[in-house]
Regions:
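A structural "hinge/loop" feature
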Residues: 1, 20-23, 50, 72-73, ...
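N-terminal lobe/hinge region of extracytoplasmic solute-binding protein
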Residues: 1-31, 62, 131
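Sec-exported extracytoplasmic/periplasmic mature domains
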Residues: 9-13, 45, 62-69, 100, ...
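Gly/Pro-rich hinge or "lid" segments in bacterial periplasmic/extracellular proteins
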Residues: 12-15, 106-166, 170-171, 178-182
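Aromatic- and charge-enriched surface segment that lines or borders ligand/interaction sites
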Residues: 26-70, 86, 92, 177, ...
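Surface-exposed binding/hinge segments that line
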Residues: 39, 74-117, 135-142
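Alpha-helical secondary-structure segments
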Residues: 53-60, 88-94, 134-135, 166-171, ...
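Extracellular/periplasmic solute-recognition and catalytic clefts
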Residues: 64, 82-84, 139-150, 175-239, ...
Length: 257
């Protein structure tokens, strides 16, 4: 959750393979490329005022590679041999082998409060408002319905270069819909302002109604040159019935969109 949990470094979206110090003010990559040391800013703090220290970084890393977290993290950081706290504000990550991107990938680790998570299971749902390292804290929520975030007035990094022009909303609310049909009807009723549709059937059949007729909702295709997936029917032509091209064409004619 980027609203609540900060990272050691901040990636630059318009500079490939670049990152800037955020919680960490610098890192030093060893000459042999087999370790990297991060140095944490003295003024980096959690939402409760506790300073962020190397033990929090170590705890966050160990938690995310544990069996309680999603396996993707263990795969993502598989080349990390160990993490060692050097002192209160510095931590070293050692590698099994050279990896030209690993020192940047480590910078993406979200930092949790070790004190807050103490005694809690990461694999279970925790219905408490956590201590955050990011710009927002939880103001209110209802399980399965919504969560509302409030900007932390004491956010430590508001004037950091890595946060220039960002996080300008005082309140951000996420509403949860049990399926896309419900979500689309909520959109058509005006509960939110924009929807990105990627389902051809819904696009052809369901985007209609009074607000469309009144031009209060604009249905528009925005063409782009980005890579995108495909939607369609893939016929198994090893089966006799699908080997005839006319049969495949006939099946497509059965759909009115």
């Amino acid at each position: 959750n980027v609203l609540m949990f900060e990272t050691l470094m901040e990636r630059s979206l318009d500079e490939p393979s670049s990152s800037y110090g955020h919680i960490a003010y610098k890192y030093i990559l060893a000459d042999d490329g087999l370790s990297v040391t991060y140095y944490i800013k003295d003024h980096a703090k959690f939402s409760n005022g506790d300073e962020i220290v190397a033990d929090d970084v170590l705890f966050s890393y160990q938690t995310l590679i544990s069996k309680d977290a999603h396996p993707q993290y263990r795969i993502y950081w598989a080349d990390i041999k160990k993490a060692t706290v050097l002192d209160k504000k510095s931590i070293r990550f050692s590698f099994y082998k050279k990896n030209p991107e690993l020192h940047m990938i480590i910078g993406d680790i979200p930092i949790f409060s070790k004190k807050w998570f103490d005694g809690k299971s990461f694999s279970e749902s925790i219905l408490e408002m956590p201590i955050a390292s990011g710009p927002y804290i939880i103001e209110d929520y209802e399980t399965g319905k919504y969560i509302r975030y409030k900007k932390n007035p004491n956010y430590w990094a508001m004037n950091e270069p890595t946060r220039s022009g960002m996080f300008n909303f005082d309140i951000i609310t996420f509403k949860y819909y049990k399926d896309m049909t419900v979500a689309l009807e909520a959109f058509k009723a005006g509960e939110y302002d924009f929807i990105h549709e990627n389902h051809s059937k819904r696009w052809a059949r369901d985007y209609n109604g009074p607000n469309f007729n009144k031009k209060l909702i604009i249905k528009e295709e925005l063409h782009h040159s980005n890579n995108a997936g495909i939607q369609g029917f893939i016929f198994n032509t090893r089966k006799e019935i699908f080997r005839d091209k006319k049969v495949r064409e006939a099946i497509t004619l059965a759909f009115a969109f």
